[in-house]
Amino acid sequence: MKLSTIFTVFAATIATVAGYETTGSKQTVDILIDYVIKETPELSQNDVANWENGDTVTLQYVVNNNEETEITVVGVTGQFKNPINNEIVTNLTTGKVGPIAVPPGEAIKFDQKINVDLIPANYELIPHVFIAQDSLIKVIPCRGQLATIVDAAVSFFDPRLIFLELVLLVTFAGLLYVGYEIWGKQYFKSVAPVKAKKTSTKASSPVASASTSAATGYDTNWIPESHLKQKKTKKVN
């Protein structure tokens, strides 16, 4: 069968399979498919993966062809299900693979990247692999993987958070300045203590000088002292 025909059938199969569930009678195939999570290869089927929104999870598949004829891996997809009621929460985007031919008795590996972006909760991930064999496209489900998804913790030094903090700080400072200009100045003026004026002791000098000038009829400050003494002597005689 030509590869172009396989791809045509593969596209038609994806379009007609609702929720990536196979229709019609189930067939038994001797094809073993398993995977490991590259980021946490120690996790098994009985473990619970812990992922954060924004993570990228890489599934590395191993496909063993125990059939008597050659098979071809042409695509991969999957589902996140509710582990309690088994309802489908979301379908993964269908990805094209290869095509990768797998002769009888051999095995191949390939990767699938999954971007985690779900409401924080518990899920079961169930991948599906599309296999072309004998002019047919077969959808083979893989084992499920339980996972707990949470939102990523926001770091205090996150650039987006720092920018938000700066915006809030500038806004708060601006509001304080406007409030001071409108109400603050008037308030501080009204409550500020009034300073008492100090009486200068030098103020008596001009008064005394003026009194002397008025009594003599002229300003005596410029008259030599010897002349004044002579005048006083004459008055006594």
Swiss-Prot record:
Query: According to its record, what are the GO cellular component terms?
Result: endoplasmic reticulum membrane
Stretches assigned to the Extracellular side: 20-161
- List the subcellular locations: Endoplasmic reticulum membrane
Q: Does the keyword Signal apply?
A: yes
**Regions of compositional bias (Low complexity) in chain numbering:** 201-216
The membrane-topology field of this record reads: Single-pass type I membrane protein
Query: Which InterPro entries does this one have?
Result: TRAP_alpha
Region Disordered: list its residue ranges: 198-219
Family per similarity comment? Belongs to the IRC22 family.
> What is this protein's name?
Increased recombination centers protein 22
